[in-house]
Amino acid sequence: MALDVLTNLNQVRNIGIMAHIDAGKTTTTERILFYTGKNYKIGETHEGASTMDFMAQEKERGITIQSAATTCFWNRQTHDPDEKFQINIIDTPGHVDFTAEVERSLRVLDGAVAVFDGKEGVEPQSETVWRQADKYGVPRICFINKMDKLGADFYYSVSTIKEKLGATPLVVQLPIGAENDFSGVVDLIRMKAYVWNDIKDDQGAHYDTVEIPDDLKERAEQYRSELLDQVAETDEELLEKYLENGDLSEQEIRGAIRQLTIAREAYPVLCGSAFKDKGVQPMLDAVVDYLPSPEDVPSIVGFDPSDESVEIDRKPTMDDPFSALVFKISTHPFYGKLVFVRVYSGSVKPGDNVLDSTKGKKERVGKIFQMHADKENPVDAAEAGNIYTFVGLKNVTTGDTLCDEKHPISLESMTFPDPVIEVAVEPKTKADQEKMSLALAKLSDEDPTFQVKTDEESGQTLISGMGELQLDIIVDRMRREFKVECNVGKPQVAYRETIRKAVMNQEYTHKKQTGGSGQFAKVLMNFEPLDTENGEVYEFVNEVTGGHITKEFIPSIDAGVQEAMESGILAGFPVVGVKATVTDGQVHDVDSSEMAFKIAGSMCFKEAAPKAKPVILEPIMAVEVRTPEEYMGDVMGDLNSRRGSIQSMNDATGVKVIDAKVPLSEMFGYIGDLRSKTQGRAMFTMQMDSYAEVPKAVADEIIKAQRGE
């Protein structure tokens, strides 16, 4: 069935739903789809029936792994109901192992709904996702969910937005009742209350608009006047009017909130309970009222693929040439490769040719769909400002730019963190070998943080990713989707190596004379350490003057150095944090070649590296443990014994919160130990923080193990 697509971009919203794991993100999305008329029956996550969680593993585990995209339509309910809006939603995972899914979704969104747990407020993963949204400049509204939960506290949650995120909350609603008595919300703009009646067959579709309950009037007045103080300052005229009349119209308040939200100066806060069907419709109204349309977002800026110094911008209109960014790839049993794109300008039809400017290759668009979770709705064209799925593209990968062949542009690609954990996998039978290679190639195509490599010495296949859960799911998908049975080794930490000292004027000459044409390349190079804590991985600088090395050979030196860095210095782990500068060298008219200079670059690094004070780096995790007070001493003692350093201790509702930094190698099996120390009453989350130098005693053990001693 073909979908309507609204052509007026003012009425389109591209949004993401983002949160900490278990804050109720997928349930919130399910309710949105139900109330916008996309679903006829609500799917419950805990029953394994959720629409957005369509992979078998997601249904079993009740978590969201891949960001599903869907399109729905909405007419406001709390005011001006005649205008129809199109909302393209991406539901993103909250689990730390799936940060790539979150990163790539945020890159193509115009706005987001941040969902918080009404009892916990801002949690570690909410902070991570919030920072990712800051990085991509995504305006947000906040939805404090689970207001029916025991211990839910709206005002505490709002305070954590201020304190932990350093953000300015704009409270536009107050809850009516809490925990079991939560029945609705007060709208501080209209000064009305929306109350839901618990009639099961209604599923929260209807609510009553009533006067504010007496016991909340005073508090509502106080919060409204704070809201007016905040919004009046956006505009001098507005401030004057507010000071004169002591009030502003609903339209003026909404306009000012929209302005503050789009500028990311403040974040509207709403509340509800998605699971209990309360508060979702006013939140949808807030999505269209406050989050930007593609027209409110600045033009996308890219550069000329043939000259990176030339900036090009594309406006979100049909008149500008076609440009789009690939933000996700997945495999479909029938269509093969599904390529998810955000179209920034122009349009494209099925059958059109486009240029993949990242790879410099032409591609032909087969079919174009708008997705509803895992169902495809064909459309006649992909137009500026919307999100689509293309079929028929052959060599495209995540982060590629697609554009008009006659008007090429390259958009900024996406950066993904390096994997921190790896396991060896081997097929159970010879017949599985080829199937496994094919499956791993397809799966690594889908997820940029999942990598596959073959250990040259042992011949083993190593898969690496952001955490144990991610790798479990990959192995599970190989079994289910590709029918590959394999044995899995124990998880290993993805160590890195770096240098601490500069080595200057390292010289290397590669010379081979064997009848016929020989090989010759001479290089003089400097190798200096970079700041790995700031994510500086590698830099190559060409300072050769006077044509001592011809331009065509310079990239080969660079490639040679990078190849040598891959195989390590001390223990065979990839080297990071190196600035390589080629300062001089020599060529031979006949015997010099790209290969000769690649070997020279590689050998120059290999000879310099042992003199550059090499060290091993290990991934350090930011760990947060929430524990009842009586187990605090045991938990801290245990973290210290794992080479952890305690960063802070705080109080949260009924528990103590310990923040620590602990090496990943010490965290395997931690969940079982924590449960036994606290009788199952403590919980923890961890996420990648940084790489740090391994203490010498530990480094010696690692080197011995790598050498098989």
UniProtKB/Swiss-Prot annotation:
Signal peptide location: none
Positions with a binding annotation for GTP: 19-26, 91-95, 145-148
GO BP: any one term: ribosome disassembly
One term of GO molecular function: GTPase activity
Superkingdom, natural source: Bacteria
GO CC annotation: cytoplasm
Pfam families: EFG_C, EFG_III, EFG_IV, GTP_EFTU, GTP_EFTU_D2
Keyword line: Cytoplasm, Elongation factor, GTP-binding, Nucleotide-binding, Protein biosynthesis
Matching SUPFAM superfamilies: EF-G C-terminal domain-like, P-loop containing nucleoside triphosphate hydrolases, Ribosomal protein S5 domain 2-like, Translation proteins
Subcellular location: Cytoplasm
Listed PANTHER family: RIBOSOME-RELEASING FACTOR 2, MITOCHONDRIAL (PTHR43261:SF1), TRANSLATION ELONGATION FACTOR G-RELATED (PTHR43261)
Protein's job: Catalyzes the GTP-dependent ribosomal translocation step during translation elongation. During this step, the ribosome changes from the pre-translocational (PRE) to the post-translocational (POST) state as the newly formed A-site-bound peptidyl-tRNA and P-site-bound deacylated tRNA move to the P and E sites, respectively. Catalyzes the coordinated movement of the two tRNA molecules, the mRNA and conformational changes in the ribosome.
Protein name: Elongation factor G
Organism: Bifidobacterium animalis subsp. lactis (strain AD011)
Gene giving rise to this polypeptide: fusA
